Curated annotation (Swiss-Prot):
The modification Phosphoserine is found at S270. Identified in a complex with ZNF541, HDAC1 and HSPA2. Identified in a complex with ZNF541 and HDAC1. Identified in a complex with HDAC1, HDAC2, DNTTIP1 and ZNF541. The keyword ATP-binding does not apply. SUPFAM superfamilies: POZ domain. The lineage of its organism: Eukaryota, Metazoa, Chordata, Craniata, Vertebrata. Its main location: nucleus. Residues 664-760 are annotated as: Disordered. It comes from the Eukaryota. Transcription regulator which is essential for male fertility and for the completion of meiotic prophase in spermatocytes. Regulates progression of the pachytene stage of meiotic prophase and promotes the transcriptional activation activity ZNF541. Required for the organization of chromosomes during metaphase I. This is BTB/POZ domain-containing protein KCTD19.
Length: 927
């Protein structure tokens, strides 16, 4: 056999694998020795032009032993601690020789010998370490010096740990901290240890691996240390530096109880006793931390700085095009540094920069450029840099998870098997929606929880020693199936029995609190028992029979869209033996409500745009309707805040019964009675003088429901569906494969009266659509005013095969831009529908339709549109109203036009679930 040290392979002869965030390279010659394995089948299928890394959604730490076996055909001694998990991986990857070796080991016919060459390089360091490697946009060419090389786990973001953030090749500890925790304990972040800052998270450098126990205490107020913990001196030294009184007291109590249970609780200090955390050191503004971070790097690393802001100008962000920001974007999905959260902080930022020296000059220039008076671009001019784009996020989308002192990679499908995780807004924050996720927990313990999410079964090391901490973590994730799996774990039962002699005071977590499933909102995530997932757990004992191995099949699913940093990555979906049964709670990935886990900013600030109500699960607090608008933008839209499709509830598009016929049906819009319409927030047309009286007027009000008994002609919407029936996202996963793959025959759209087309209103149901700024808010339907019916008429109405693999979509607009775009569309459609519903004379309705058409086609300016609209009889017309409405239309119309183009593209690509339309010309010609 060739000596390990003599192995040298060129980059062209290497296959690259990303296993749960661990990066491995295997020579072609070694992998070819296992021709029946899934690894060889998929890697060898790559063409020479495909320089990709195959992604496997499995535990990377365990794959080290698989990797070592691929090189040496031997097992390392260290693999004994996790044989069950190693067995599961070998079975899923169809590595039959490794399975035979594990069987022999189990039966005592194979003995492991401890030799220096058997110890993988990565195992010599704690799992809390990482080593610096260059972050590039293609697979790294790792120097393979011996078969002992078992892969590089990018536990810290490679881009962050490379120049310019850390110009070192030494091993460094790091930790991801939610900003809420930093605000509570400011001493955690200093100028020296801050590595990066985002809207929801701060990344800091730590002095020791024991720092994770400190963060765990600050979250739970409990000292949870491993059995026989020996590094108490190191931990105590770190605690003294932080000067957090309750933490210091908890560690002191633990040292007093050395030899007892490793669980010490400390009640939270009462107000006024927070020591440094409350009185000595106050919370620093974000701009102090962000600017202090940037000035540590040369201008060449920053590139050209620029300031971005929300539309109301209250929140400022700084970004650049230098190497620093490029590295951060590759790993976190966003590189915007938050500067301010309120209007008042903008003034404070200006005053702060005025007092700074030349070091802050690039920041000063960027801020001055941003604050210079600018005029809005004409509505007929769209940015040359902007193009309509619709990005698809499939269940195989790779998600990076940052958990305390570790990071992992998995797929969106895995996270959605148990949607309780993403619904847990106390523990989960999206850094960049659909790309990177911050989980507020212990990184080392989350490895076992993630394996449960993948496999539906707990796989713990044979000598697991952190039971108190693991129990605490399981309880706080609120996943019933996980709690039940721990309660049934034999190792856990044995451990609790060993602790029976200890009193309840010293050992309060002797029994695990199991969260049971009820009939609450989460019940709707349950999956049809007939449908199974691709990743199923396998018991070690159940797989001793060779028969299922020969039947094991694997398939590769290519992700249709990958994040920028993973363009070279494909996803291997491991399918295990057919007889394996999934334990726990089966669930479907096809429901998207759990994806609404919100960053902290979108709920707690009145400057944020109002939220769209989630149609399935409410994860955010409703804004208080009584609070007055506090920002210029909110004051501006207060006039039209009720123009959120006045008839949105009344002119409801009725769902059609599932019909097997392909005929085009018409659905009349339902108009509720006045009593039904009254409570709805959007039913008072503030811009119609004859529809509403002043809020201060105590007299009777005539709401939009007036005259319902004697209705005039109402709009009808002709729906056509890309598939046989209207399908919701929740129902999509429950369909049989035949239902998904059989589109309905194409239905022609009617002629829109040629050039005499005054426009149409579309109602498009589609997968959840998010912005391109990482926000977690989304829309699942769009009401669009359009004059481009010809584009839709010539579009194939058959469902795209991609639709089956769509979890959500992203438009090339920010969430805020999409929000105001929808407001503008609903305003235009509302004034038309309200005129029809109010039985206005045909001349008035025609005038309103004509004005909307001329505005949309840019044949009239926004100012002239407002003047002509308010001049129509029945509208309130005063100078104040004109100015506010003109400003609002001028602001939102460009966003609406961009949003309309994105929706058109969505329909053309066959990504809509259903489309209903109403051609407005018919109402102008009816007698």
């Amino acid at each position: 056999m060739e000596e390990p040290g003599g192995l040298h392979e060129s980059a062209e002869d290497l296959f690259h694998f990303n296993v749960g965030g661990w990066h491995f390279s295997v020579p072609r010659s070694k992998l070819a020795q296992f021709p029946d394995s899934l690894l060889w089948k998929e890697a060898s299928a790559l063409t020479s032009s495909e320089n990709q890394r195959l992604f496997i959604d499995r535990d990377g730490s365990t794959f080290r032993h698989v990797h070592y076996y691929l090189y040496t055909s031997k097992l390392s001694f260290s693999s004994c601690a996790e044989l069950n998990l190693l067995y599961e991986q070998a079975l899923g990857l169809q590595l039959m020789p490794l399975l035979q070796t594990l069987d022999n080991l189990k039966e005592g016919r194979h003995h492991l010998r401890v030799r220096p060459a058997d110890i993988p390089v990565a195992e010599r360091a704690s799992l809390n370490y990482w080593r610096t490697w260059k972050c590039i946009s293609k697979p790294s060419d790792f120097p393979i010096k011996s078969p002992a090389f078992t892969g590089l786990h990018d536990k810290a973001p490679l881009g962050l740990m490379d120049t310019p953030l850390l110009d070192t090749e030494e091993e460094v500890h790091y930790c991801f901290l939610p900003l809420d925790l930093v605000a509570k304990y400011p001493s955690l972040v200093t100028e020296d240890n801050l590595l990066w800052l985002a809207e929801t998270v701060a990344l800091i450098e730590c002095e020791c691996s024991e720092f994770r126990f400190i963060v765990n205490f600050l979250r739970s107020h409990k000292i949870l240390l491993p059995d026989n913990f020996s590094n108490i001196d190191v931990l105590e030294a770190e605690v003294e530096i932080l000067e957090i009184p309750e933490l210091t007291e908890a560690v002191r109590l633990y040292r007093m109880n050395m030899g007892g249970c490793s669980r010490t609780s400390c009640p939270p200090l009462s107000p006024g006793k927070g020591g440094r955390t409350a009185s000595v050191e106050s919370v620093k503004p974000l701009y102090l931390m962000a600017l202090g971070l940037l000035v540590k790097y040369p201008d060449s690393a920053l590139g050209q700085l620029r300031i971005e802001s929300t539309l109301d100008g209250s929140r400022l962000y700084i970004t650049g095009n230098g190497a620093l920001f490029q590295h951060v974007r590759n790993w976190l999905g966003t590189c915007r540094l938050p500067l301010t959260e309120t209007i008042s902080e903008v003034y404070e930022l200006c005053a702060f920069l005025d007092k700074r020296d030349i070091t802050y000059e690039p920041m000063k220039v960027a801020l001055k450029t941003h604050l210079e008076p600018r005029t809005l671009l004409p509505v007929d001019v769209l940015s040359e840099e902007w193009t309509a784009e619709v990005t698809i996020y499939s269940p195989q989308q790779i998600i990076k998870l940052y958990v305390g002192s570790h990071w992992y990679a998995t797929t969106l499908q895995t996270l959605m098997k148990y949607p309780e995780l993403l619904s847990n807004t106390q523990r989960v924050y999206w850094i960049a929606y659909g790309q990177t996720l911050l989980i507020h927990g212990d990184g080392q313990m989350f490895r076992h929880i993630l394996n449960f999410l993948r496999l539906g079964k707990l796989f713990l090391p044979s000598e697991f020693k952190e039971w108190p901490l693991f129990c605490q973590e399981v309880e706080e994730y609120h996943i019933p199936a996980l709690s039940e799996a721990l309660a049934q774990c034999e190792a856990y039962k044995s451990w609790t029995q060993e602790k029976e002699s200890e009193n309840e005071e010293a050992f309060p977590i002797r029994k695990l609190h199991v969260v049971t499933e009820g009939t609450g909102p989460m019940a709707e995530f349950s999956r049809d028992a007939k449908e199974t997932t691709a990743c199923m757990p396998v018991d070690f004992q159940e797989c001793s029979d060779r028969t299922p191995w020969n039947k094991a099949k694997g398939n590769l699913t290519r992700s249709s869209q990958m994040e920028e940093a993973e363009q070279y990555t494909r996803t291997i979906q491991v399918s295990l033996c057919r007889n394996a049964k999934r334990g726990g709670n089966p669930s479907t990935y096809s429901h998207c409500s759990g994806l609404c886990a919100n960053p902290r900013h979108w709920g707690g600030h009145s400057e944020s745009p109002p939220k769209k109500k989630c149609t399935t699960i409410n994860l955010t607090q409703k804004p208080d309707a009584k609070d007055p608008p506090v920002t210029p933008m909110q004051k501006l839209i207060s006039l039209v805040r009720e123009w959120d499709m006045v008839n949105c509830k009344q002119w409801e598009f009725q769902p059609l019964p599932a019909s097997r016929s392909s005929s085009v049906e018409e659905a009349s819009l339902h108009v509720p009675s006045g009593s039904e319409a009254a409570p709805q927030p959007g039913t008072s047309a503030a811009w119609k003088a004859h529809s509403i009286t002043s809020e201060k007027d105590a007299g009777p009000q005539t709401g939009p429901g007036a005259g319902v008994k004697d209705k005039g002609p109402e709009p009808t919407f002709k729906p056509y569906f890309p598939t046989k029936r209207a399908i919701t996202l929740k129902d999509w996963g429950k369909q049989r494969p035949k239902d998904r793959e059989s589109p309905a025959p194409e239905q022609p759209l009617p002629n829109a009266n040629g050039t005499d087309n005054p426009g149409a209103i579309l109602k498009v149901a589609h997968p959840p659509v998010v912005g391109n700024d990482g926000s977690c808010m989304f829309f699942e339907d769009s009401i669009i005013y359009t004059t481009q019916m010809d584009n839709i008429k010539h579009t194939s109405l058959t469902a795209s095969p991609q639709l089956r693999e769509v979890t959500f979509l992203s438009f090339s607009l920010s969430w805020e831009e999409m929000f105001y775009a929808q407001k503008c569309h609903r305003f235009l459609t509302d004034i038309i529908l309200d005129s029809i519903r109010q039985k206005d004379p045909k001349a008035i309705t025609a005038k309103v339709v004509s004005l909307a058409y001329r505005l949309w086609t840019l044949n009239i300016s926004p100012k002239q549109f407002v003047v002509d609209l308010l001049a129509i009889a029945g509208f309130k017309d005063d100078r104040h109203t004109q100015e506010r409405l003109y400003s609002w239309v001028e602001l939102t119309l460009p966003f609406a036009r961009k949003y309309g183009r994105c929706v058109d593209l969505l329909i053309q690509r066959g990504l809509s679930r259903s489309v209903s339309y109403s051609v407005l010309g018919k109402y102008l010609h009816e007698g």
